[in-house]
Swiss-Prot record:
SUPFAM superfamilies in the record: PH domain-like (SSF50729)
Annotated protein name in UniProt: Meiotic expression up-regulated protein 6
Provenance organism: Schizosaccharomyces pombe (strain 972 / ATCC 24843)
Disordered as annotated region, ranges: 1-102, 365-430, 468-514, 587-630
UniProt keyword list: Meiosis
One GO MF term attached to the UniProt entry: lipid binding
Domain of life: Eukaryota
Family matches, as CDD domains: PH
PROSITE patterns for the chain: PH_DOMAIN (PS50003)
Keyword Hydrolase: no
Skewed-composition ranges (Basic and acidic residues): 1-12, 21-30, 90-102
InterPro entries the UniProt entry points to: Meu6 (IPR039712), Meu6_PH_dom (IPR039483), PH-like_dom_sf (IPR011993), PH_domain (IPR001849)
Length: 651
């Protein structure tokens, strides 16, 4: 392994490890030379003359291989007496000359860094050094590529295959080549000639390839967006590469197109080589004995996890029964990509049963529509031209009067339309969605009906009702009061429900925020206040004030203030009565309280009542002490005002 630059790399010389295999032609002469070398060594070690004469036969074997020049006295060297110093250098020189004739140096035609997609367990984009070579490559350099896909190494190859591998038939070997054909075929081609192969390694400083792309199986080169370009293969797969700049992209495209144009010549030339076929068979037997690597087995079975169990069958059927090794790579990449994005893998091919079940509901809906539409049209459209104008005139007012009975019909029509749309879009009737749609349609129908009723309410004219004395709470029977309260509460509930529907229809939120019940958000609306009838003014207070006008101003103010305080305690903050005051026993209209309109007239002695005594007492108390009486009968004032009597006050 060299760590020099691409331009300064030493020429890699092919050194196959199958050196002692007799089937290689280039190793036959080498084996003969090894035999000669072994024979020459004992000759040099023997010093006895008797042994030298007995072993004259091996000396004859050496004579025909290299004819010796006639020895003369001038040519003899005293140092040549020792045969060890002469025999070894000659054999090494012969080996080096033969290797120099047979070997072809590796030449780099193109090279540069490209971005590619990894074919490992974790998919990612990586930067690798790509290059193309001419000439054979050593097995030692291809050992790393072999380890990635198979167990064992190429360096420790046995000289002779085991008995089990020898007994294996050629048909079994061929079936094995179909499964691991691509990797072994690339290694066997690289040992003979690197033309038609695209290598890539981790960096420019290493000559050990980590991956090989077979350009003889490529079909075309397509330029992509940016600096990308794609290599399309016979099996339908593709390899996308990205250059660093547009110039390098153009050079790579031209070089790869030239290599693909010569693929037929290189393929025919390599297949004719006997060494290529022998190497491929030995690699197949070695791979069968060692087995695939763990990562390769994982890639082989991973498409069943990512694309389903039918992915492997479909890929093998589409390519004539042969397995496509690139399916595992793409399936692995898609599997991790879907796992990162949170998606579930979906099969491209659907079973025929699923197709049949999905097709049946669509056909039924189409047939129903095709049957129903003509019937409706035949019922509506007139058959003759004479009745045509009459029907058009009669249809128009019907369409205008339709909203009076429309909400129920509209709800049913919208429901049918929505159900039909769900069936046509999805292809299958969905019961749950239909139930939800029915509930929504019912809610909208109720809201439409409510709005329609509110809009069509007739405003009644204001009619003056006769003056009727309203009975107080004390005068009413308990049974009648209870029924009245229930009727008021029921009316208030109806009004509150209407108000709640209006708020729900307009989506107006009130105070109090929202609540969640089992995950559903519920709008919290303020409860409507109960409508309680309130009196604008207490009639008893007005009559009391009217009765106090007969007194002096100072006393009348004090009396009215006292009464007002007593009544004010019975009112709420909102002006509502807590209890009905004692002055409300009089049967008088609440809207227009009576005021004293009659002027006081002098009375006779016959018309005097006991009530005058109280007024006289009050007047005398005011005149003497100017103080407020402790006891006052308030019922006397309204009675006096109602009867219209005149009161005289003695000075």
């Amino acid at each position: 392994m060299s760590y020099e630059g691409r331009e300064e790399r030493p020429e890699q010389i092919a050194e196959p490890t199958f050196e002692n295999v007799s089937e290689h032609n280039e190793h036959d002469s080498g084996s003969a030379e090894a035999q000669v070398e072994t024979l020459e060594v004992p000759l040099s070690n023997e010093t006895d003359n008797d042994d030298a004469t007995e072993n004259a036969v091996p000396a004859e074997v050496q004579a025909p291989e290299e004819p010796k020049e006639p020895e003369t006295v001038d040519n003899i060297d005293p140092a040549d007496d020792d045969p060890n110093s002469v025999a070894a250098p000659k054999v090494e020189e012969k080996k080096s000359k033969k290797k120099a004739k047979d070997e072809k140096p590796l030449t780099y035609t193109t090279g540069g860094y490209l971005y590619c997609r990894s074919n490992g367990l974790i998919p990612h984009v990586m930067k690798r050094y790509f290059y193309m070579l001419e000439g054979p490559m050593s097995m030692d350099l291809l050992d790393h590529y072999y380890k990635k896909h198979f167990h064992g190494t190429l360096q420790g190859n046995p000289t002779e295959p085991s008995l089990a591998s020898e007994q294996m038939h050629d048909s079994d070997a061929d079936s094995l080549f179909q499964s691991a054909n691509d990797h072994l075929n690339r290694i066997a081609k690289a040992t003979q000639d690197c033309r038609g192969l695209l290598f890539y390694s981790k960096s420019q400083s290493t000559s050990v390839p980590s991956g090989i792309i077979n350009l003889t199986d490529a079909v075309s080169i397509e330029p992509g967006t940016g600096n990308k370009f794609t290599i399309n293969f016979n099996n339908g797969k593709s390899e996308t590469l990205e250059a660093l700049d547009p110039e390098s992209k153009n050079t790579w495209i031209t070089d790869l197109k030239n290599a693909i144009a010569k693929k037929k010549e290189t393929k025919d030339k390599i297949k004719e080589l006997r060494a290529y076929n022998d190497t491929l068979k030995r690699l197949g037997k070695l791979a069968a004995r060692s087995g695939p690597s763990a990562s390769e087995t994982f890639r082989y079975f991973l498409p069943m996890l990512s694309n389903g169990r039918d992915a492997k069958k479909s890929s093998s059927k589409s390519h004539g029964g042969k397995q496509n090794n690139s399916v595992a790579k793409d399936g692995l990449f898609d599997f991790f990509q879907n796992m990162i994005k949170g998606k579930t893998p979906q099969n491209d091919t659907a079973s025929p049963i699923d197709n049949e079940t999905s097709a049946d509901p669509v056909d039924t809906t189409v047939e129903a529509q095709s049957v129903e539409v003509p019937e409706n049209e035949t019922n509506q459209i007139p058959t003759t031209e004479e009745h045509f104008p009459a029907t058009t005139e009669e249809v128009a007012p019907a369409s205008e009067e339709k909203p009076a009975t429309g909400p129920a019909e509209e709800s049913t029509s919208t429901q049918n339309v929505e159900q039909a749309s769900t069936q046509n879009d999805n292809g299958t009737p969905i019961g749950q969605i239909a139930d939800a749609i029915e509930e929504d349609v019912k809610g909208t129908a109720q809201s439409v009906e409510q709005a329609f009723i509110e809009e069509t309410d007739i405003a009644l004219p204001d009619i003056a009702l006769p003056d009727v004395a309203t009975p107080t709470a004390d005068d009413q029977d308990p049974s009648t009061a209870a029924t009245n309260e229930e009727s008021v509460v029921s009316n208030e509930d109806r009004t509150s429900k209407k108000a709640g529907k209006k708020h729900h229809r307009h989506h107006k939120k009130k105070k109090g925020g929202n609540k969640r019940v089992f995950g559903f958000k519920l709008h919290k609306y303020a409860k409507p206040t109960k409508s309680v009838k309130t009196l604008q003014a207490d009639p008893s207070l007005e009559f009391a004030k009217a009765g106090f006008e007969i007194f002096p101003s100072n006393l009348s103010k004090k009396l009215s203030g006292l009464v007002q305080k007593k009544v004010h305690k019975k009112f709420d903050k909102d002006g509502r009565l807590k209890e009905i005051s004692q002055f409300s026993k009089t049967t008088i209209k609440p809207e227009t309280p009576l005021t004293p309109t009659t002027t006081p007239t002098p009375r006779t002695a016959a018309q005097e009542d006991p009530a005058e005594e109280t007024t006289d007492a009050l007047a005398s108390a005011e005149g003497e002490n100017n103080q407020m009486p402790q006891v006052l009968e308030t019922e006397a004032a309204p009675s006096i005002a109602s009867e219209g009597r005149s009161i005289t006050v003695n000075a």
